[in-house]
């Protein structure tokens, strides 16, 4: 519902296919690939094609409702949708869950470094791969 309200405030349309893709991304609780989304959408939207999914994903990215995990070529729901922000993504190599964390001090330092380097930043996201606490506990059993 928050996504619908946000889109209405911005004057953009959260179409049924966009909403279905958003729900699937959120329901997965893990990074999900576009073709996996297509497989899940097909029973609901038999005419859906890869371009359908990519257009929906592009819209959701533009609206800040999801994030792209570059290293996995996959997508996760944004926990802080509604306003632009930088994120630190902790990605579990075992279960593929992604935790979005605020990291204001890290981002401040990175900002200072890029200014000193006269580097024009287009987007900032840090992806860190490792083992989450749940998987670490399971490994110890």
Give residue ranges: language-model regions.
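Short capping segments at the starts of secondary-structure elements
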Residues: 14, 27-33
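A short acidic, leucine-rich amphipathic alpha-helix
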Residues: 36-42, 53
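Pre-recognition alpha-helix immediately N-terminal to the DNA-recognition helix
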Residues: 19-24
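Short, Lys/Arg-enriched N-terminal segment that forms or immediately precedes the first helix
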Residues: 1-11
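Non-DNA-binding regulatory cores of transcription-related proteins
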Residues: 62-141
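Basic amphipathic alpha-helical segments that dock to polyanions
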Residues: 53-63
């Amino acid at each position: 519902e928050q996504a619908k309200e946000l889109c209405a405030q911005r004057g953009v349309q959260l179409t049924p296919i966009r909403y279905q893709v958003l729900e699937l991304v959120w329901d997965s609780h893990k990074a999900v690939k576009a073709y996996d989304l297509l497989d899940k959408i097909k029973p609901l939207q038999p005419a859906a094609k890869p371009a359908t999914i990519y257009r929906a994903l592009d819209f959701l990215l533009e609206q800040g409702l999801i994030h792209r995990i570059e290293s996995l070529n996959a997508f996760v729901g944004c926990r802080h949708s509604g306003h632009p922000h930088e994120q630190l993504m902790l990605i579990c190599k075992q279960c593929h869950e992604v935790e979005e964390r605020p990291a204001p001090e890290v981002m401040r330092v990175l900002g200072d470094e890029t200014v000193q380097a006269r580097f024009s930043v287009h987007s900032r996201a840090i992806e860190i791969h490792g083992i989450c606490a749940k998987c670490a506990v399971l490994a110890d059993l």
